[in-house]
Regions:
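Rossmann-fold dehydrogenase core element
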Residues: 32-33, 85-86, 112-116
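Catalytic-core segments of class I nucleotidyltransferases/pyrophosphorylases
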Residues: 61, 68, 74-81, 97, ...
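A short, conserved acidic/glycine-rich loop-to-beta-strand motif
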Residues: 84-95
């Protein structure tokens, strides 16, 4: 992300927060990171609202930490800057090998999302939501109007912006690492990927 020109980060912590904070504080990137402990999780949108002063009025990248994404982030940012008119969010997508386990999308010829299906029995596609977004600051105003402390970005925000969400396809590597099996698999896959590209 730093190679793409991103210079400041905010990370919310909760589970095993002391270990996470200790790791980050010893990192060479520590001076670029603001750590925010949430005793009770505010959900993705709630965290954004609570830290809107950190974001100011600029577009920001919103990343779910239980994913491992390897891609050209400069290209991702460029795609957002050059997105179609009237779109306010750019969602990273990827091809999933298990579409029943995640949110899948249907997009039009312009790359704009027309349908979103969250963990359905008969998913209509294998193009999945990578839970990595570039978001215009105007979206924060909408989230604030919900008058909720806890705002789920996938449930409370994405449906409202249907037809106004552009997509960026990550064809290099993306995996949900929210459980031990997928985390171990990601280590094997990325090790192999780095060997192939080095």
């Amino acid at each position: 992300l730093t190679k793409a020109g991103i210079e400041k980060f905010l990370i919310n912590t909760h589970y095993l927060h002391e270990q996470v904070e200790s790791y980050i504080e010893q990192s060479k990137f520590a001076c670029m990171v603001d750590l925010v402990y949430e005793e009770e999780l505010l959900l993705t949108g709630g965290t954004v609202i609570a830290n809107k002063d950190f974001i100011s009025d600029e577009p920001f990248m919103l990343v779910h930490a239980d994913n491992l994404s390897i891609c050209d982030y400069k290209d991702f940012i460029s795609a957002h800057k050059n997105r179609p008119a009237n779109t306010e969010i750019t969602m990273m997508t990827f091809t999933t090998d298990d579409p029943k386990s995640c949110g899948v999308v249907k997009i039009d010829n312009s790359g704009i999302i027309q349908e979103f299906h969250e963990k359905v029995q008969n998913p209509p596609s294998t193009t999945a939501n990578g839970a990595v977004y570039i978001v215009e600051a105007s979206v924060i105003s909408y989230m604030e109007r919900l008058n909720k402390v806890k705002v789920d970005f996938s449930v409370d925000v994405l449906p409202y912006y249907m037809g106004r969400i552009f997509t960026y396809y990550n064809g290099l590597y993306h995996r949900d690492i929210g459980n031990i099996r997928s985390y171990e698999l990601a280590q094997i896959e990325t090790d192999s990927l780095y060997r192939e590209t080095s």
